Amino acid sequence: MPESTTPAYITSLIRHFEDLRDGTHGGSVSRRDKEAHFEKAVQMLAPVARQVLTEMNMSLLLGSAQLTETGLRRTADGGLNASWALSWPEQRAAGVELIVLQAYFGGSFHHPHLRGTTVHDWPLNVFSDEDAAAQLSILRAIASSDLHNLVYRADYRIVPAVTASSGTQLANGAKTT
């Protein structure tokens, strides 16, 4: 399959498997260089993560959520992480976790990953703005899966778009039933 027609998720998996094969990440061998790649990846990924969570907030949570982000920080195991999270009234009342998109590079990890609150471990291979933008569908899938799993931990009432009056117009012009 030519590179130009290869879907982003396949490219990401190929990079991941090649890194495992070669003992590298983005061409880097040392932890220090890999962390430098990770720091840049977080900077490029931040606007994409914010876009995904803003879409969910506006379309599903009816603008009721608060978006927070941590920025890059060192973890207890010596790794690095950054996260973007949505919290909203129904989620807090139900006592379930936030929807979280997290980029993390565990202290003993060979390379970094993406994860959600309930969805874990997708290879993070971002080395350009284009790579970051290509993660949009993956971040959407992680955030959507998190919300789906959180509904099962609580119930559908944590999603304001579902509890709004029947026939509510959604952002895309469709109506709920």
Regions found by a protein language model. Give the residues of each.
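Intrinsically disordered, low-complexity regulatory segments enriched in Ser/Thr/Pro
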Residues: 3, 7, 12-15, 81-138
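N-terminal, Lys/Arg- and Ser/Thr-rich interaction peptides
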Residues: 1-33
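Negatively charged, low-complexity tracts enriched in Asp/Glu with abundant Ser/Thr
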Residues: 25-83, 172-176
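Generic detector of well-ordered alpha-helical segments enriched in charged/polar residues
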Residues: 11-14, 18, 39-42, 136-140, ...
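Short, flexible helical or helix-coil boundary motifs
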Residues: 17-20, 24, 52, 60, ...
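Ampiphathic alpha-helical segments that act as solvent-exposed interaction surfaces
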Residues: 109-177
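Feature targets compositionally biased, intrinsically disordered low-complexity regions
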Residues: 70, 77-78, 94, 105-106, ...
